[in-house]
């Protein structure tokens, strides 16, 4: 089975393998109210406090406390996603700073996770392994942590996991036995990733490998979510890739660059490509060669991509129900399923899980809205995200918002109740509403809410020497890399 990220880049559909009953979950008791000591950058309406807490609770409550593995999706039976583990490892310190868990509780959860991955078996065998060459399989059994059958060793998902590992390495900086061990194991996990091995077509980084078939015949190139992959690989103190890799990866940028809804930008379509790397790395004011030549930076670029998606929804060229300034946001997410029938008076094609988006390179839009698309961009474009979320909550909140925040997606144009849905249900007067929440979509909501409110995740990651080394080897200069304050 191809990895989800490779399928997303090709805008194909993902058919997940059979489900696994999730491990028993232990929910820790609620704690006394706490006033955050985080510096206030921007205030938000009270609803967003609740949303951030509920999204944190998703990671704290659904992760297997015995090994730290976070589910790919919940509440349905699920395997673990290593990318979701990376977001979870970042979520725990946010919980500390917001007073939702103690530092010791978070440190223990992190240490449990890191120890599991430190000791998990690595090898070439097709079963019974968690990873190989320092990389990890995209999906793991929630209980055993072993490879989910048929799944690939994933470069990008390993990188998203490692983003959480490096974040914890920098956050847990106290001189205690527990925090020293966190830093030591985090360094060990990162240092043993053999990044050059994952380059069957150097200097590009390949998408993945399986014991059965070897390397996937595609590499990451061009503007997408793989920025963080290349930066981590360039920054490795033990197995770095050649510095020419960034230039090779970005060589195809010209085909992604252009004017989309009145804004010059690198445009890929699904908003997750603009959000994943920037959930951790502060790109405000720092520039590589391409951005220097175009008098921009990746933060500004993501703002323009977000604003263009809103304008696309206002234009609503396909005539989907509800689209406009108060409802927009296309990204990779769940969908009702693969169906073709009449809706809104037109012949329509709907999809299951797919890389929805609108941009220069193409559009895939079936009327499905993912709350993570807008919320993951709140730090880029708060003036349009905040009122959109408030309007969406007022109109659809009773159906799409719950104990762990927003469901993954919903579709106001889909009302057929006589088909076998991939997940979720059709709610009268609302449309299709997913029943699942995905870790890789909950993560950007939590991290970017906190980055907008306090800059916390960005500030911690700016201290990580491997991230700085990777950025500098990629040719980034200016901004906080030169000691200047990061401004929005």
Question: PLM ranges: what are they?
Answer:
Residues 9-19:
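Bacterial N-terminal signal peptides
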Residues 3-4, 17, 24:
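N-terminal leader/targeting segments
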Residues 1-9:
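Bacterial N-terminal signal peptides that target proteins for export
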Residues 24-488:
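Ser/Thr/Asn(+Pro)-rich, low-complexity disordered segments
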């Amino acid at each position: 089975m191809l990895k989800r990220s490779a399928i997303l880049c090709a805008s194909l559909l993902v058919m997940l393998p059979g489900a696994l009953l999730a491990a028993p979950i232990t929910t820790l008791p609620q704690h006394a109210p706490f006033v955050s000591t985080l510096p206030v950058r921007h205030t938000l309406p009270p609803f967003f406090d609740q949303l951030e807490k509920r999204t944190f609770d998703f990671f704290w409550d659904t992760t297997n406390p015995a090994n730290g593995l976070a589910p790919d999706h919940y509440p349905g039976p699920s395997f673990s996603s290593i990318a979701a583990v990376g977001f979870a490892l970042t979520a725990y310190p946010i919980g500390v700073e917001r007073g939702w868990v103690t530092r010791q509780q978070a440190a223990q959860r992190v240490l449990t996770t890191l120890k599991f991955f430190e000791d998990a078996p690595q090898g070439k065998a097709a079963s019974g392994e968690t990873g190989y060459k320092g990389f990890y399989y995209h999906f793991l059994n929630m209980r055993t942590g072993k490879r989910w059958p048929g799944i690939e060793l994933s470069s990008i998902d390993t990188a998203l996991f490692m983003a959480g590992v490096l974040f914890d390495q920098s956050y847990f900086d106290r001189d205690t036995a527990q925090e020293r061990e966190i830093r030591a194991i985090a360094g060990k996990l990162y240092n043993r990733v053999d990044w050059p091995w994952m380059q069957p077509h150097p200097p590009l980084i390949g998408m993945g490998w399986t014991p059965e078939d070897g390397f996937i015949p595609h590499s990451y190139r061009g503007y997408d979510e793989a920025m963080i992959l290349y930066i981590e690989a360039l920054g490795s103190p033990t197995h770095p890739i050649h510095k020419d890799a960034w230039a090779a990866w970005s060589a195809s940028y010209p085909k992604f660059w252009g004017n989309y809804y009145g804004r010059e930008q690198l445009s890929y379509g699904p908003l997750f490509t603009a959000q994943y790397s920037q959930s951790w790395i502060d790109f405000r004011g720092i520039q590589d060669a391409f951005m220097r030549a175009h008098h921009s930076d990746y933060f500004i670029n993501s703002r323009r991509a977000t604003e263009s998606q809103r304008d696309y929804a206002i234009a609503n060229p396909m005539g989907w129900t509800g689209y406009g300034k108060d409802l927009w946001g296309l990204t990779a997410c769940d969908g009702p399923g693969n169906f073709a029938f009449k809706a809104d008076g037109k012949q329509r094609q709907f999809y299951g899980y797919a890389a929805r988006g609108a941009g220069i390179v193409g559009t895939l839009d079936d009327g499905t809205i993912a709350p993570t698309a807008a919320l993951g961009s709140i730090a880029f474009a708060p003036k349009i995200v905040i009122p959109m979320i408030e309007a969406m909550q007022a109109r659809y909140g009773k159906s799409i918002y719950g104990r762990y925040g927003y469901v993954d997606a919903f579709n106001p144009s889909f009302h057929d109740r006589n088909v076998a849905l991939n997940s979720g249900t059709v709610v009268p007067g609302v449309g299709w509403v997913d029943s699942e929440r995905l870790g890789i979509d909950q993560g950007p909501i939590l991290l970017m809410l906190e980055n907008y409110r306090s800059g916390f995740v960005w500030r911690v990651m700016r201290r990580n020497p491997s991230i700085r080394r990777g950025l500098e080897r990629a040719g980034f200069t200016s901004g906080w890399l030169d000691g200047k304050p990061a401004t929005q």
